[in-house]
Amino acid sequence: MSEEACRTRSQKRTLEPDLTEDDVENKKMKMEKGSSELTVDGDSRVMPEPSAGSAQGLLRTTEAMGTGSGEGLLGDGPVDMRTSHSDMKSEKRPPSPDVIVLSDSEQPSSPRVNGLTTVALKDTSTEALLKSSPEERERMIKQLKEELRLEEAKLVLLKKLRQSQIQKEATAQKPTASSGSTVTTPPPLVRGTQNIPAGKTSLQTSSTRIPGSIIPPPLVRGGQQVSAKLGPQASSQVVMPPLVRGAQIHNIRQHSSTGPPPLLLAPRASVPSMQIQGQRIIQQGLIRVANVPNTSLLVNIPQPTAASMKGTAVASAQANSTPTSVASVVASAESPASRQAAAKLALRKQLEKTLLEIPPPKPPAPEMNFLPSAANNEFIYLVGLEEVVQNLLETQAGRISATAAAAVLSREPYMCVQCKTDFTCRWREKGGAVMCENCMTSNQKKALKVEHTSRLKAAFVKALQQEQEMEQRLLQQGVGTASIKAEPAAPHPTLKQVIKPRRKLAFRSGEARVWNNGSSLQASSQLSRGSATAPRGVLHTFSQSPKLQNAASATALVSRTGRHSERVVGTGKGTASNWKKTPLSTGGTLAFVSPSLAVHKTSSAVDRQREYLLDMIPPRSIPQSATWK
């Protein structure tokens, strides 16, 4: 029944004239009949009593009217038919939504609504309670208590329903909020050799994405090609830089310069140096800002590779060198001091570990394992035992003779051997020596401390011995490597024999003065221009001079030896390409001239040119790492 119908019916009821006494009597008869039927069914708790007065009958009438017809209920309060028109207007309130109003068509014999008994004592005024009997009063109190309990249960249920509704609303708002302004896309985890297209939604910011979204970096592993193409909406978003690991070709095409630079991590293995689109080759071990439009900073952790060991064009035999040979060269280039420091650090860590494993000295456990209090049973037992012993001693004291008592009294008390005291709570005897309690515990603590110190000292001595052994081993290894390096450092004997006579001939004949400044300038400029040409071409340039012909013959002689068979002059590759391309000044020599020849330098331009030509064929192969230290 709707609220409007309830309001109209209540207004009609208020507009009706006051009921006469006959009408009241008729209604009273009807309601008593209905209430008697209810009592037979056992659903009603209100019993009509003949001993009750007129007020009691009126109370029952109003109760039955409120429960049977249900039309007089305008809220939670009852409707008294004797009230005037103004009182009804003042008491009229809008019905609450929790009240279920019954229609006239329903039978009064169905007093249950939603399983609850609706026969309630609505009029609980003080007069009615005073006039009613004690049994009636107790019944009313019980019923009111039940109603209160039911209302409390209903309130708890409503609170729980409200909480569940709030939780459902929160869970329903979460997916909608995820598609809202705070979009967090999880990073795609890509493994293996995969090609991620530029149109993929995980790496491309589409125009339909809502601004303010935060995209974590895509985690890319292995040899992948990632081409991230950001749309024009990238300026309103926080796009994290992609993490690139390994030898990946990372092509970045950005329409706006707001994207962060890619973070280039170290390669997992020795691979050729990476080439970024529109940039120059990044040499390993260097950190450069590449000349891309968005000024991305490419950070590369240095790792030795085959392509990063040379800065210029390399000979074909050296370009085919494997990464393992390069790694061996780098490993050999490590200084023994660094190895020694690493070994010392490992020893120190091991010493710390052993020191932590040594347990600290623990004090001895006290023998009295209880507190002397009256709440402790063991202490009470001991007190009782002491009382018993004392009683026995007192009873037996009369039987002991005077001589025995004198002997007991004349006995000297104990004295501590260490501290010479004659009083303690407990005497200790160890090896015939009587000691007090304090001295005994202090001796035990000292012994434990000495044992702990000896353990620590033994651990330190062991670590020191290991460190000394390691230093001796490293010294032996250093001596061995120095002797191995000293052997190839000596120049070839045939080269020495060639050099010395040529020098003597040059100084004897006095042809050193024939060379003028212009010829030396021309020779040095031609050498600097054609440093990548064949050695034959270099030698033909100076064929006018007899000294250069002698040097050419020395070159041919050296090239025939077995040790230098790999550097044959007939190859079309330039041997000068193994060193740096530096423009040579007048009579300038290279920085890595052999130490055996550095002693014979003179101020003469002829000698400097001869030294340069002879140094073109080194006596030993210079390692590749020597040019890039």
UniProtKB/Swiss-Prot annotation:
<keyword id="KW-0805">Transcription regulation</keyword>
<keyword id="KW-1017">Isopeptide bond</keyword>
<dbReference type="InterPro" id="IPR032346">
    <property type="entry name" value="P66_CC"/>
</dbReference>
<feature type="region of interest" description="CR1; interaction with HDAC1, HDAC2, MBD2 and MTA2">
    <location>
        <begin position="140"/>
        <end position="174"/>
    </location>
</feature>
<feature type="coiled-coil region">
    <location>
        <begin position="135"/>
        <end position="170"/>
    </location>
</feature>
<dbReference type="GO" id="GO:0001842">
    <property type="term" value="P:neural fold formation"/>
</dbReference>
<dbReference type="GO" id="GO:0005634">
    <property type="term" value="C:nucleus"/>
</dbReference>
<feature type="compositionally biased region" description="Polar residues">
    <location>
        <begin position="169"/>
        <end position="184"/>
    </location>
</feature>
<dbReference type="GO" id="GO:0001701">
    <property type="term" value="P:in utero embryonic development"/>
</dbReference>
<keyword id="KW-0832">Ubl conjugation</keyword>
<feature type="modified residue" description="Phosphoserine">
    <location>
        <position position="338"/>
    </location>
</feature>
<feature type="region of interest" description="Disordered">
    <location>
        <begin position="1"/>
        <end position="115"/>
    </location>
</feature>
<dbReference type="GO" id="GO:0016607">
    <property type="term" value="C:nuclear speck"/>
</dbReference>
<feature type="modified residue" description="Phosphoserine">
    <location>
        <position position="545"/>
    </location>
</feature>
<dbReference type="GO" id="GO:0042659">
    <property type="term" value="P:regulation of cell fate specification"/>
</dbReference>
<keyword id="KW-0479">Metal-binding</keyword>
<feature type="cross-link" description="Glycyl lysine isopeptide (Lys-Gly) (interchain with G-Cter in SUMO2)">
    <location>
        <position position="547"/>
    </location>
</feature>
<dbReference type="Pfam" id="PF16563">
    <property type="entry name" value="P66_CC"/>
</dbReference>
<dbReference type="GO" id="GO:0045893">
    <property type="term" value="P:positive regulation of DNA-templated transcription"/>
</dbReference>
<feature type="modified residue" description="Phosphoserine">
    <location>
        <position position="110"/>
    </location>
</feature>
<feature type="cross-link" description="Glycyl lysine isopeptide (Lys-Gly) (interchain with G-Cter in SUMO2)">
    <location>
        <position position="174"/>
    </location>
</feature>
<feature type="modified residue" description="Phosphoserine">
    <location>
        <position position="543"/>
    </location>
</feature>
<protein>
    <recommendedName>
        <fullName>Transcriptional repressor p66 alpha</fullName>
    </recommendedName>
</protein>
<feature type="compositionally biased region" description="Polar residues">
    <location>
        <begin position="104"/>
        <end position="115"/>
    </location>
</feature>
<feature type="modified residue" description="Phosphoserine">
    <location>
        <position position="553"/>
    </location>
</feature>
<feature type="modified residue" description="Phosphoserine">
    <location>
        <position position="109"/>
    </location>
</feature>
<feature type="modified residue" description="Phosphothreonine">
    <location>
        <position position="185"/>
    </location>
</feature>
<feature type="compositionally biased region" description="Polar residues">
    <location>
        <begin position="192"/>
        <end position="210"/>
    </location>
</feature>
<dbReference type="GO" id="GO:0000122">
    <property type="term" value="P:negative regulation of transcription by RNA polymerase II"/>
</dbReference>
<dbReference type="GO" id="GO:0008270">
    <property type="term" value="F:zinc ion binding"/>
</dbReference>
<dbReference type="GO" id="GO:0001568">
    <property type="term" value="P:blood vessel development"/>
</dbReference>
<feature type="modified residue" description="Omega-N-methylarginine">
    <location>
        <position position="280"/>
    </location>
</feature>
<feature type="region of interest" description="CR2; histone tail-binding and interaction with CHD4 and CDK2AP1">
    <location>
        <begin position="335"/>
        <end position="478"/>
    </location>
</feature>
<feature type="modified residue" description="Phosphoserine">
    <location>
        <position position="594"/>
    </location>
</feature>
<feature type="modified residue" description="Phosphoserine">
    <location>
        <position position="509"/>
    </location>
</feature>
<dbReference type="GO" id="GO:0006338">
    <property type="term" value="P:chromatin remodeling"/>
</dbReference>
<dbReference type="GO" id="GO:0010172">
    <property type="term" value="P:embryonic body morphogenesis"/>
</dbReference>
<feature type="compositionally biased region" description="Basic and acidic residues">
    <location>
        <begin position="25"/>
        <end position="35"/>
    </location>
</feature>
<keyword id="KW-0175">Coiled coil</keyword>
<feature type="modified residue" description="Phosphothreonine">
    <location>
        <position position="20"/>
    </location>
</feature>
<feature type="modified residue" description="Asymmetric dimethylarginine; alternate">
    <location>
        <position position="536"/>
    </location>
</feature>
<dbReference type="GO" id="GO:0021506">
    <property type="term" value="P:anterior neuropore closure"/>
</dbReference>
